[in-house]
Amino acid sequence: AELLVSPYPQEFAIASAAASALAPVKVQGIPLQKFLASLDSKKLYIVGYERPLVLLFNKLNLNPYVLDDMSRKPGVLPSWVGPHLLNDADWLWITCQALRDRQMLSLEKLMKNTKKVVLLGPGIPWLPDVLRAIGINFVAQPRPLHDKAGDVFNYIAAGGNYWDHELFSWEVHQL
């Protein structure tokens, strides 16, 4: 449990993977591409920079606003502007980075006012009651496509990315 509040990304990754393994998603989700096709968003925000997600949203002309203190990139705003901007958010996507740096905790009141909040995995334990209580409506997680645990392990251990590999499918689960 102490690793879940670790400032080190490696320790947080281990702890979140363990928590997710102890409380896995038990329901079938909607494929991410199908879920994104149904988004009707004028104001979409991402808390924490997740490059593949930003690229995917831009490709779909969703034009997200990204709030992140770690990334100095065009189109990325500092997180301190979040409370001023998020009041009119249609969709709020929260990355694991926002969990690790505890930025999500400072946004709890705003999350409860936003009707569509997605917590982005991997490594999110399936605790629907807890997640709903803090204002989360959806959890997006990668799921291994095949029963090839060894292949998945080797791919991730070699530094592979779970975003763009045929071993994974992204699913969105409604709470």
Language-model segments: residues:
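Electropositive, gly/pro-rich neighborhoods at or near active sites that engage anionic ligands
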Residues: 1-51, 56-58, 154, 170-175
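Active-site glycine-rich loop that binds ribose-phosphate moieties when present
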Residues: 28-32, 71-81, 99-101
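Structural motif
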Residues: 45, 91-95, 118
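Short, polar loop motifs at secondary-structure junctions
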Residues: 49-52, 66-72, 122-126
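Histidine/lysine/aspartate-rich catalytic loop segments that bind and position anionic ligands
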Residues: 56-85, 89-90
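A short helix->loop->beta-strand "cap" motif at the edges of active sites that frequently abuts
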Residues: 61-62, 111-116, 136
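C-terminal functional extensions of proteins
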Residues: 118-175
